């Protein structure tokens, strides 16, 4: 029976059509409508430290970040936004709490968008008209950022705690105020640190209007826990077509947030998949150290930036089948590895040469692809 090479699908399947929303602009990045789901992060530097902040933004840009948010807790931070907005490679969102005057400074600075928290900005409802007028004149969009940790006291009194309904009521009320002033260039987030409550809130919000939605699990936690929480919540919502831009919140370097966010989108076929390592979890049948093999191959191919699936399998049960379905793979056993390329065995090599052979073949395949970007290979054997 001839080998069937599945590899990367030519036309990726998605679980559900994207929800129809209005489209807004955050600087040069489109959000909502038919735009791809964008990935955001937030700097961890002191915003007034311009060089450090721009360096971190450059690192985020290189990682694949589309939009970056910076904290504006003080007037000094607001005063440097015009420099950051001018020099940043990607659009900047100014994150504003408590002080409404910082919103106007940010708009005048030329940022891509301003995030406002209706739960803690002083007399926010009274400021909406002026904010809408200034933002509209400057072509700056707004994010209405509702957060479970800073809901207005009246909503906490009404609902007893930060329920999905409380989050949505806050968001819809503020949206209605902006729309009363003929301002429609905004997106909404209703964040909670419990993925279940967060999912329920976004589902409710999606039913109430055509606003673009920014997905986030707030205060998700350390890298492992936060990744699980965000992947769970985002996976559910995005698979239902809900969500137009995402931020994975981790107690980790910002670039890690971007990597996780991109991987979530790639896993759902909402972004073109890049390098994908398929490796077995190992068991008593494994005849090689699969963990070490997979890690070495991953490290050695981290420079590859094309849709390439590489299977690293440790035995003959699923190994040959998985290897055939990848562009490149190895089925290991008895001190040797069968190397598959596009479904066909091209050679058998000693176990000690598996990693080097896979890296060499991956580089060759990547170079043949139109979007190939193979960088400088790093071989660990």
UniProtKB/Swiss-Prot annotation:
Stretch forming the signal peptide: none
Species assigned in the record: Clavibacter michiganensis subsp. michiganensis (strain NCPPB 382)
Gene3D superfamilies the UniProt entry points to: Dihydropteroate synthase-like (3.20.20.20), Sulfite Reductase Hemoprotein, domain 1 (3.30.413.10)
Entry EC no(s): 1.17.7.3
Gene that encodes it: ispG
Pathway: Isoprenoid biosynthesis; isopentenyl diphosphate biosynthesis via DXP pathway; isopentenyl diphosphate from 1-deoxy-D-xylulose 5-phosphate: step 5/6
Keywords: 4Fe-4S, Iron, Iron-sulfur, Isoprene biosynthesis, Metal-binding, Oxidoreductase
Function of the molecule: Converts 2C-methyl-D-erythritol 2,4-cyclodiphosphate (ME-2,4cPP) into 1-hydroxy-2-methyl-2-(E)-butenyl 4-diphosphate.
Protein name: 4-hydroxy-3-methylbut-2-en-1-yl diphosphate synthase (flavodoxin)
Listed GO MF terms: 4 iron, 4 sulfur cluster binding; 4-hydroxy-3-methylbut-2-en-1-yl diphosphate synthase activity (ferredoxin); 4-hydroxy-3-methylbut-2-enyl-diphosphate synthase activity (flavodoxin); iron ion binding
Catalysed reactions, as listed in the record: (2E)-4-hydroxy-3-methylbut-2-enyl diphosphate + oxidized [flavodoxin] + H2O + 2 H(+) = 2-C-methyl-D-erythritol 2,4-cyclic diphosphate + reduced [flavodoxin]
Pfam families per UniProt: GcpE
UniProt KW Oxidoreductase keyword: yes
Entry-linked NCBIfam families: ispG_gcpE, PRK00366.1
Residues the record lists as binding [4Fe-4S] cluster: 280, 283, 315, 322
Domain of life, per lineage: Bacteria
Cofactor(s) needed by this chain: [4Fe-4S] cluster
PANTHER family: 4-HYDROXY-3-METHYLBUT-2-EN-1-YL DIPHOSPHATE SYNTHASE, 4-HYDROXY-3-METHYLBUT-2-EN-1-YL DIPHOSPHATE SYNTHASE (FERREDOXIN), CHLOROPLASTIC
Enzyme class: oxidoreductase
Similarity comment: family membership: Belongs to the IspG family.
GO terms (BP aspect): isopentenyl diphosphate biosynthetic process, methylerythritol 4-phosphate pathway; terpenoid biosynthetic process
């Amino acid at each position: 029976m001839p080998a069937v090479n599945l590899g990367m699908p030519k036309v990726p399947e998605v679980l559900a059509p994207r929800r129809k929303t209005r489209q807004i602009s955050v600087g040069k990045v489109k959000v909502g409508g038919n735009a791809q789901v964008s990935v955001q992060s937030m700097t961890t530097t002191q915003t007034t430290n311009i060089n450090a902040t721009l360096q971190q933004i450059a690192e985020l840009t290189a990682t694949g970040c589309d939009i970056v948010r910076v904290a504006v807790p003080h007037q000094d931070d607001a005063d440097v936004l015009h420099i950051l907005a001018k020099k940043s490679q990607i659009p900047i969102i100014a994150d504003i709490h408590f002080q409404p005057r910082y919103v106007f400074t940010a708009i005048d600075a030329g940022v891509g968008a301003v995030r406002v928290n209706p739960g803690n900005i002083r007399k926010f409802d009274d400021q909406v008209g002026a904010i809408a007028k200034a933002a509209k004149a400057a072509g700056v969009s707004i994010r209405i950022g509702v957060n479970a940790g800073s809901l207005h006291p009246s909503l906490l009194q009404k609902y007893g705690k930060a329920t999905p309904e409380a989050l949505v009521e806050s968001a819809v009320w503020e949206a209605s105020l902006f729309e009363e002033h003929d301002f429609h260039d905004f997106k909404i987030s209703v964040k909670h640190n419990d993925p279940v409550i967060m999912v329920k809130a976004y589902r409710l919000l999606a039913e109430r209007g055509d606003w673009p939605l920014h997905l986030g699990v707030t205060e998700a936690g350390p890298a492992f826990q936060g990744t699980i929480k965000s992947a769970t919540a985002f996976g559910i919502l995005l698979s239902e077509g809900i969500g137009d831009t995402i931020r994975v919140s981790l107690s980790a370097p910002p670039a890690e947030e971007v990597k996780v966010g991109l991987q979530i989108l790639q896993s759902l076929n909402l972004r073109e998949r890049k390098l994908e390592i398929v490796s077995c979890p190992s068991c008593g049948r494994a005849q090689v150290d699969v963990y070490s093999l997979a890690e070495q191959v991953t490290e050695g191919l981290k420079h590859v930036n094309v849709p390439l699936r590489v299977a690293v399998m440790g035995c003959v049960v699923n190994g040959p089948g998985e290897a055939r379905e990848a562009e490149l793979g190895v089925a290991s056993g008895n001190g040797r590895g069968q190397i598959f390329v596009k479904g066909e065995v091209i050679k058998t090599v000693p176990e000690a040469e598996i990693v080097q052979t896979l890296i060499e073949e991956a580089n060759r395949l990547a170079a043949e692809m139109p979007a190939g970007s193979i960088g400088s290979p790093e071989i660990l054997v």
